[in-house]
């Protein structure tokens, strides 16, 4: 497979004025027609905790620590993407079936705070709410690490993630579709849940650009992932989530994007071979959580600014420009604690 590299490197420390001007003018992207996105997936209420060691830290010893809650807000891939695009000025319509716990209500409130339209978000006793605790600590050798623990709000029953039903006379997905009075410019989702895949397939049949993100691929469920990818226009995943790329040969009518961490990003448009773009270097990394979500949201936003919200609009030049802009945002966000640090620092 042909692989090309394009060298357009930036260093965040040298381009702060550029990225800050992008941030300050974020809502000037679309004066004539406000773009819209509908998105769904597995949402979390993230609690970001930092461990402090009041008596100092000695490698190899059991050190006393205290935990300080730094941030508590909606997170996860779909939560971040939809909130970031709401902040960018899009009409952002998340779909979510939360419970009516305090945590579930906060997630809805957070969506509104970031500019989302919560018309398709519900808080009911039958809903589900996921909680994720992210602890910033030091390992036994004194190196910074992140520890993750997922839990669920009181009253959230199994299964934790709630979705529309697709079968039976009382199926809720057909009712949702029947009640829609508009088509978004983009439909985004990140799970293999049948309802969200079927909604994406239907959206695509109506001319909506469908963006599918693979967070983690379990090979025993590979056929489900492949089905989602085949029914989408844009497919994105990281090199950590997906290592074997042999299936990409079956996606020759797609845009496939793979993020490479510190090595940058690469894309394959319509089976023409991989094009590798360099990273945007940041010499002041605080927290890399959420960088992939910033890449996704900023890439979608960059496409919108260029009027490229139809798959036919995608060219190598447009994708290159948009992915480099997306990496600018993702790299900048790494200088802040939390998945939406840029927003917090600029509001």
Task: Name these PLM-found stretches.
Residues 82-84, 286-314:
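Short, small-residue alpha-helix embedded
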């Amino acid at each position: 497979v042909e692989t090309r590299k394009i060298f357009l490197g930036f260093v965040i420390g040298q381009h702060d004025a550029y990225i800050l001007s992008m941030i300050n003018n974020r809502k000037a992207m679309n004066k004539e027609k406000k773009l819209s996105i509908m998105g769904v997936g597995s949402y979390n209420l993230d609690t970001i905790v930092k461990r402090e060691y009041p008596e100092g830290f000695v490698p190899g010893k059991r050190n006393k620590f205290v935990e300080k809650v730094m941030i508590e807000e909606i997170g996860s891939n779909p939560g971040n993407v939809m909130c970031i695009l709401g902040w960018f000025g899009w009409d952002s319509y998340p779909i979510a079936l939360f419970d009516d716990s305090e945590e579930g209500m906060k997630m809805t409130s957070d969506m509104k705070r970031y500019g989302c339209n919560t018309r398709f978000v519900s808080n009911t006793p039958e809903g589900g709410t996921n909680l994720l605790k992210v602890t910033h600590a030091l390992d036994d050798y004194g190196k910074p690490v992140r520890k993750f623990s997922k839990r669920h709000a009181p009253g959230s029953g199994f299964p934790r993630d709630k979705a529309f039903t697709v079968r039976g006379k009382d199926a809720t997905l057909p009712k949702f579709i029947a009640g829609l009075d508009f088509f978004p410019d983009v439909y985004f989702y990140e799970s293999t849940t049948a309802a969200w895949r079927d909604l994406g397939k239907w959206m695509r049949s109506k001319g909506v650009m469908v963006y599918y993100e693979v967070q983690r691929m379990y090979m025993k469920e590979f056929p489900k992932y492949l089905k989602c990818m085949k029914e989408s226009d844009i497919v994105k995943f990281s090199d950590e989530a997906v290592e074997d790329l042999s299936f990409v040969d079956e996606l020759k009518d797609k845009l496939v994007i793979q993020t490479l961490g510190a090595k940058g990003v690469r894309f394959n448009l319509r089976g023409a071979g991989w094009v590798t773009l360099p990273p945007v270097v940041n010499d002041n990394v605080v927290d890399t959580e959420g960088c992939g979500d910033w890449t996704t949201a900023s890439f979608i936003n960059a496409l919108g600014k260029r009027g490229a919200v139809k798959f036919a609009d995608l060219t190598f030049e447009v994708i290159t420009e948009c992915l480099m802009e997306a990496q600018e945002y993702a790299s900048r966000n790494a200088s802040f604690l939390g998945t939406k640090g840029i927003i917090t620092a600029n509001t």
